[in-house]
Amino acid sequence: IVGGTDAPRGKYPYQVSLRAPKHFCGGSISKRYVLTAAHCLVGKSKHQVTVHAGSVLLNKEEAVYNAEELIVNKNYNSIRLINDIGLIRVSKDISYTQLVQPVKLPVSNTIKAGDPVVLTGWGRIYVNGPIPNNLQQITLSIVNQQTCKFKHWGLTDSQICTFTKLGEGACDGDSGGPLVANGVQIGIVSYGHPCAVGSPNVFTRVYSFLDWIQKNQL
């Protein structure tokens, strides 16, 4: 995240770090699954991916879970970057504590342009910059779909965009992480023009994939 601030411990108990063995993407948790982006999982094997929960610091080990299965949406298109959603089934139930909690998923698609949303992640703090040790947080705004379509040709209704200003937004390593409105995850970090150069960030719209998520969380 470019332009963010250090997230306090326990404020985002649903956020996890995916590692192989270094941090490569973010995700959010339910009892047995991690929700993330498809592009995070493509080319990875379940044997190399671990899920790290319960800490805002990358160098402080809390709860570590092994991946049992990597599930990529079969309609994921790596050229158009649509249907960019995936799940990791972990090898045992995630144990909930004050610092490890599931994220709520949306029951309706009520989010609209101008709404404030919170993005969290351990992505780079500027283009080609370092990965921060402390989880970063930033408040962004939802952008009108039409405006976003001008900037990102091929945008679909199953995607959602954010923008605030130049110098704020997602960066490499934030992918797969949660975009949250009022405690409900509405987006998954998908792509943007790296990084924070004045163009909207694009997220997978969680509401559009509720059926897929349910079907694949056996």
UniProtKB/Swiss-Prot annotation:
GO terms for biological process: proteolysis. It is found in: Secreted, Extracellular space. Disulfide bonds join C25-C40, C148-C161, C171-C195. Keywords: Disulfide bond, Hydrolase, Protease, Secreted, Serine protease. CDD domains: Tryp_SPc. It holds the Pfam family Trypsin. Residues 1-218 form the Peptidase S1 domain. Its main location: secreted. The active site is at H39 (charge relay system), D84 (charge relay system), S175 (charge relay system). One of its GO terms (cellular component) is extracellular region. GO terms for molecular function: serine-type endopeptidase activity. It catalyses: Preferential cleavage: Tyr-|-Xaa, Trp-|-Xaa, Phe-|-Xaa, Leu-|-Xaa. Its EC number is 3.4.21.1. It comes from the Eukaryota. An additional Arg at the carboxyl end was found in some of the molecules. PANTHER family: FI18310P1-RELATED, POLYSERASE-RELATED. Belongs to the peptidase S1 family. This is Chymotrypsin-2. It comes from Vespa crabro (European hornet). The lineage of its organism: Eukaryota, Metazoa, Ecdysozoa, Arthropoda, Hexapoda.
